[in-house]
């Protein structure tokens, strides 16, 4: 009986590893050809019960390796920029800019999948390709391997090989959804777009690495 249990566990483990490898390969295949990504987005945060807690719109730009620009519009205006080494977070309402080192935890932020190293997906996430939810849509469910992750699960959805949404859940059961429109892939983006010029008269907070 113990042998049968051990064999069952081994078989399930092997099947899980094969599913993860297949998911990683499929997801990497979709992401590896994306050198730049520009889009408008709508971000909605919901409570565990489904109540809308926050909704913002904005634009993002991403360029490999490691360059990212994110700006939300009023009334919750904020700009986040990284050059791959440090991050600038600008809150106009507070007249404040926070500058911090791009730590491993921050580099695992979901949106940074668009500018990070595709080859590291397998190191950072367990990846499972989901059954087709609707014709032409491909979904992947990612679970972070790190214990200090900012989220528990992340779903990436593609239509016609193009990323259309991200949905993540945290440990409190809250869900944040990102839906992309006006997507442009592999268009030229100057690296100047990923360096933040600090406005005059704002407070600057530099966090230690």
Swiss-Prot record:
The keyword Metal-binding does not apply. Pfam families: LolA. It is found in: Periplasm. Keywords: Chaperone, Periplasm, Protein transport, Signal, Transport. Its main location: periplasm. The keyword Glycoprotein does not apply. It comes from Hahella chejuensis (strain KCTC 2396). One of its GO terms (cellular component) is outer membrane-bounded periplasmic space. This is Outer-membrane lipoprotein carrier protein. Participates in the translocation of lipoproteins from the inner membrane to the outer membrane. Only forms a complex with a lipoprotein if the residue after the N-terminal Cys is not an aspartate (The Asp acts as a targeting signal to indicate that the lipoprotein should stay in the inner membrane). Residues 1-21 form the signal peptide. Belongs to the LolA family. PANTHER family: OUTER-MEMBRANE LIPOPROTEIN CARRIER PROTEIN. GO terms for biological process: lipoprotein localization to outer membrane; lipoprotein transport. Monomer.
